[in-house]
């Protein structure tokens, strides 16, 4: 018989309006990305201890949960009067890393369409892996876990409850995973839309027309630089000159002299044009 004495387990104080897990039994995660998150936590050795937080998550002991770039914070009500403060840290990707991710996602119409419609592409992990990044935590060391409770176990039941509700929050909003890594939904979608629009634009639209200095083209100053379409002058009636003559008052057979000369002027002009001017 062991001589080590452990205090009896204490019951947590009830919470009004706490965040309760939607699942009342069985697995908590519902979508592939939240299931993947839980699976990753189990793979890195946190699985057995996560079970301690299921009852806390389902009872609504988590008072608040917030996801920011690189940090998840929560308040969890335990057996003491003051709630415990939870912090789960993960390295957020930098601007240049996200720029590479967004460029790669934008190049694939399927990825862009899925994300713009609010869904997480099933092989999005491959995009990050191809750039030397990991969307989900790769090792336990990548996570920084902290709880203000006196329990020495890591993760304690308060951290475990937070992990479960974090997975459920990923069910509701898959972009929370990306926000945890440093990119908010609005920024990601705006950058994807801009990258798609920029990539679809003709290359000629982006080419700058740089004028050469005059000293670099003096030898071509009088040469034709480009074909210029010069509109032809409007056609002038061949008898327009007759219309400019003053009235002579002369007539023949009851017709003005200018009218009698008009056919002759027309014939003369036609003959001149046919001969090549």
Curated annotation (Swiss-Prot):
GO terms for molecular function: zinc ion binding. It comes from the Bacteria. It holds the Pfam family SWIM. Keywords: Metal-binding, Zinc, Zinc-finger. A zinc finger (SWIM-type) spans 139-167. This is Uncharacterized protein Rv2102.
């Amino acid at each position: 018989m062991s001589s080590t004495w452990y205090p009896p387990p204490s019951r947590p104080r009830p919470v009004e309006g706490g965040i309760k897990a939607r699942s009342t039994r069985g697995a908590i995660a519902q979508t592939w990305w939240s299931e993947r998150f839980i699976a990753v936590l189990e793979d890195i050795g946190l699985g057995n201890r996560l079970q301690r937080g299921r009852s806390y998550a389902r009872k609504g002991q988590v008072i608040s949960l917030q996801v920011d770039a690189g940090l998840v914070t929560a308040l969890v009500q335990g057996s003491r009067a003051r709630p415990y403060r939870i912090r789960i840290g993960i390295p957020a990707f930098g601007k240049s890393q996200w720029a590479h991710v967004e460029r790669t996602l934008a190049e694939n119409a399927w990825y862009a369409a899925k994300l713009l419609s609010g869904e997480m592409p099933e092989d999005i992990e491959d995009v990050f892996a191809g750039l030397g990044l990991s969307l989900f935590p790769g090792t336990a060391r990548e996570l920084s876990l902290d709880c203000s409770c006196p329990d020495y176990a890591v993760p304690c039941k308060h951290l475990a409850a937070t992990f479960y509700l974090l997975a459920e929050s990923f069910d509701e909003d898959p972009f929370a995973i990306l926000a945890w890594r440093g990119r908010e939904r609005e920024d990601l979608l705006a950058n994807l839309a801009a990258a798609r629009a920029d990539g679809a634009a003709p290359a000629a639209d982006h080419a700058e027309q740089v004028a050469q200095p005059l000293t670099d083209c003096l030898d071509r100053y009088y040469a034709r630089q480009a074909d210029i379409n010069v509109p032809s002058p409007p056609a002038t009636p061949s008898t327009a000159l007759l219309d400019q003559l003053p009235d002579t008052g002369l007539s023949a057979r009851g017709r003005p002299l200018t009218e009698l000369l008009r056919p002759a002027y027309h014939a003369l002009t036609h003959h001149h044009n046919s001969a090549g001017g």
